[in-house]
Amino acid sequence: ERLREAFEQDGQRVTSIELDNFLTDREYREQKGIFTQGKQALHFELFKQSLVDITQGKKISIPRYDFVFATSSHDLDGHLKPDGAPIEIEPADIIFIEGNFPFLIPEVVHLIGIKVVYLTDDPVRMKRKWKRDIDYRKKYEPTYFRNRFFKDQFIMAEIAYRPQLEVCDICVDTSGSA
């Protein structure tokens, strides 16, 4: 949030794309045994084309993922469902891609200008995730969330954080170990 504000105060137009909005329906992923980390879990072609378009200065319309019902606004072919409501994103000078692994996907890495990994201590990360997953997305029951958060940290470090650290351009480490 502070980084966004700093860019905007400098006259830059800023927007963000949340990678999770490109998830396909959870029921489909579970039926196919697809893990949520990786392009198989996404409306991948739509994600890739959206990045191409927005980096060319075009407005994009992306899927909207409903975290309560675990469904996408788009069908498996990437078309808007009859009751779907996409997210409209205007082009900007600075485009943040929020997600656990966007620059680990070879097909889109060339579309990402500066690859930044932002590390924080568990209490800070948990507060941010609580705000997003409990307050905003209404995704988890609080006790389940706390248990899942600490259970999954090592797994996420292995499949997402460490690999990204190996290929990022900048690592912003605000953790106590920095």
Language model regions located:
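ATP-dependent NMP and nucleoside kinases share a basic, alpha-helical "lid"
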Residues: G78-Y136
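Short, structured coil segments at secondary-structure junctions
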Residues: D10, H110-I112, E166-V167
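A conserved segment at the C-terminal end of the G1
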Residues: E1-G11
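Conserved nucleotide-sensing/catalytic segment adjacent to the nucleotide-binding pocket
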Residues: T15-L19, T24-L80, I94
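Conserved beta-strand scaffold positions in the cores of enzyme catalytic domains, especially
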Residues: V14-S16, K115-V117, D169-D173
